[in-house]
C-alpha cells in the first residue's frame, strides 16, 4: 500500500491475494489456508495512475537497496517523487510479503523531504503480527535492545538497509531484504522498455534459427 505519493493522496492498496478462480494455479503460492499471486498486472485508462503505482513500489525498493553512501549517484529522484504533493504529510509505503521460507512479514516506512519519519517490521505468527523492530525518527526499538544506542543511524537511511549488513545471519532481516532484491516491477507501456524488448527479440531472431522457425509457423 502507499499514501501521499505523487498523484495519490489517499491510501491505495495493490492486493495480490488470490481469488477462488482455479485458472493459472501455477501462479499461486499457498501458505496454510491462504493463497497469493506470484505475478499481477495493472491495467486501465490512460492517465489513470498506473505508472505512479509502479513507481511507488519501485521508489520503495530503491530506498531500501541504495545505501546512504551511494545516494548521490543513485536513480532516486526525490524532487519528482514529491512533485504532486498537496500537503506536508509524509509519503507512507508498506508491503505485506511472503518470504522464501513461507514466513509472512509486514514492512513499511514514512519519509518526508528525504528524511525517514518512521519505519517498522512485523512478523505474522498464526493470525497476529508481532513487532521485530519499530523506528521513530532516529530511535529504533528492537528487543531486547534499543538499537539507537548501538548503531549510528542516519536520518536518510532505512534501518533495514543498515542492520541487514551488520547482522547478515539475522533471518528476518535477510528474508525481507532479499525479497526486495528479487522483486521486479515492469512498466510494459514504457517506450524504453518496448524498445528493449523489441531489440532483444530481433537479436534472438537473427541468432537462433529454431526461434525464427517457430515465429514463422
Regions found by a protein language model. Give the residues of each.
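Conserved P-loop NTP-binding catalytic core
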Residues: 32-35, 41, 45, 54-106, ...
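Short beta-strand segments
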Residues: 10-14, 103-107, 131
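Electropositive, glycine-dotted interaction segments
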Residues: 106-217
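Pre-Walker A-like glycine/lysine-rich segment at the N-terminus of P-loop NTPase domains
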Residues: 2-59
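A generic structural motif
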Residues: 3-5, 96-100, 122-124
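Well-ordered beta-strand positions enriched in small/hydrophobic/aromatic, beta-favoring residues
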Residues: 14, 93-95, 119, 133
Amino acid at each position: 500500500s502507499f499514501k501521499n505519493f505523487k498523484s495519490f493522496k489517499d491510501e491505495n492498496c495493490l492486493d495480490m491475494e488470490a481469488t477462488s478462480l482455479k485458472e493459472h494455479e501455477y501462479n499461486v503460492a499457498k501458505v496454510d489456508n491462504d493463497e497469493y499471486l506470484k505475478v499481477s498486472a495493472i491495467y486501465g485508462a490512460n492517465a489513470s495512475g498506473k505508472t505512479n503505482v509502479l513507481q511507488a513500489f519501485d521508489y520503495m525498493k530503491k530506498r531500501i537497496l541504495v545505501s546512504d553512501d551511494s545516494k548521490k549517484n543513485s536513480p532516486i529522484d526525490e524532487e519528482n517523487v514529491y512533485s504532486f504533493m498537496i500537503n506536508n504529510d509524509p509519503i507512507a509505503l508498506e508491503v505485506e510479503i511472503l518470504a522464501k521460507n513461507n514466513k509472512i512479514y509486514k514492512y513499511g516506512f514514512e519519509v518526508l523531504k528525504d528524511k525517514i519519519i518512521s519505519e517498522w517490521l512485523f512478523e505474522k505468527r498464526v493470525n497476529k503480527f508481532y513487532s521485530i523492530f519499530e523506528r521513530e525518527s532516529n530511535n529504533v526499538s528492537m528487543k531486547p535492545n534499543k538499537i539507537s544506542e548501538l548503531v549510528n543511524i542516519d536520518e536518510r537511511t532505512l534501518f533495514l538497509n543498515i542492520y541487514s549488513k551488520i547482522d547478515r545471519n539475522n533471518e528476518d532481516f535477510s528474508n525481507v531484504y532479499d525479497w526486495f532484491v528479487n522483486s521486479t516491477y515492469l512498466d510494459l507501456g514504457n517506450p524504453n522498455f518496448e524498445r528493449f524488448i523489441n531489440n532483444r527479440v530481433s537479436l534472438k531472431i537473427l541468432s537462433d534459427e529454431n526461434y525464427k522457425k517457430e515465429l514463422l509457423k
